[in-house]
Amino acid sequence: MPKIYFHVDVNSAFLSWSALKALQGGSTVDLRTIPAVVGGDEAKRHGVVLAKSTPAKKFGIQTGESLFAARVKCPGLTVVPPDFDLYVKNSKALIQILNDYTPDVEQYSIDEAFLDMTGTEALFGPPLTAAHTIRRRVRRELGFTVNVGIAPNRLLAKMASDFEKPDRVHTLYKYEVETKMWPLPVGDLFGVGPSAAKRLNSCGIYTIGDLARLERDTAVRLFGSRGDTLWNYANGREADPVTKQRTRDNSYGNSVTMPRDLARPEDADATMLALCDSVGRRLRADGKTARVVTVQLVDNAFRRTSHQTTLPNPTNSTDRLYHVAIELMRQMWPQRPVRLVGVSAEKTGEDNFEQMDLFTDAARIDKQEKLDRAADALRKKFGGAAVTRATLLSPDTRKPEALSAAKEREKDKK
């Protein structure tokens, strides 16, 4: 039976979700219809652009650039702060809907997922019919729009979902690759970043078709093993199956795809802090502590690596989770640049008390618990963005508020 995959991608996720929240709160202006961005500290004009509206794009505003630069381009720009709790809530709602159509759902990032729809035609009709059903249901029930790509493998499904937006369904079958994908700039190929695109251009490779028509050996000679991978991608070949999103009742986790590849572990410190902050917050909200911390990294060759450690005492402290995760991340950092960072807290139990030994700094732990509780109380009363760690407001793009960013283009698990 021929395989059929869907790639479901939320259109301008963070901006759309912020717009919906504002409208539900009584705003008469839809952020999606005006020059608006999701960014850092508006009062201090710190940080970077994490997501932008279609009108903002017309001013040349780019995801990842500083808010200062964005305001130069558009002085009347509306800036709203990031709200990771809001993103997690909407992401969960999306995945809940997708799980109604197949048990094989792989959440690729907070705002996109792959579905193995093979063999579901008797239930939901032909692929195009099923895709439009999902698209319309998300818009009707959740209030935001998605693109759905349909293809015989994940790679082509993802490429298809990036065609014309928003709120569209596109196919990219093998027989359509030459006409639909090959004419695109090589920089549009999945896995080709700006630096790789420049190098390909310097070799006379400007379109995906140019790369596809190269001799395979030539691609390998020019770009090594990465050249072989990209050559296969350009020819529409990708064999990885959808990995079913396992529901782990005792696991809390988040991951994020970065807006650009990270060469050094310290480049991911702020992102890891934000992820641990979110995980710790949800553990505390549910009255849970975790004994196992797992860190996952994906490099720019799409190789996944994960390390975990068992804590001597369970915890839900953001500070403790962060320091353990940072140590793991430094131990496992791969040779190639990293494109995805994730952390999960597992083997959870009821939050009773933390057993201490002679070497435990009781005063420090007590202080951290009070800080966590105070921050949680403020967020509960005033919203998820009420308290933001200073590190995450840095204008230095090495400290990604990229957490929230990474996507306009590009897991929360519980």
PLM segments and residue spans:
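Short, charged/polar surface micro-motifs in flexible loops or helix N-caps
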Residues: 11-13, 42-45, 300-304, 348-351
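DNA-contacting surface of Y-family translesion DNA polymerases
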Residues: 188, 196-338
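Gly/Gly-Pro- and Ser/Thr-rich, intrinsically disordered tail segments characteristic of DNA damage-repair
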Residues: 1-232, 281, 365-414
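Short, hydrophobic beta-strand segments
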Residues: 113-119, 306-309, 355-361
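Short small-residue beta-strand/loop micro-motif enriched in glycine and branched aliphatics
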Residues: 79, 303-307, 352-354
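C-terminal hydrophobic structural anchor segments
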Residues: 315, 320-380
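A glycine-rich phosphate-binding loop feature that marks nucleotide/adenosyl-phosphate handling sites
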Residues: 152-155, 234-236, 289-300, 338-349, ...
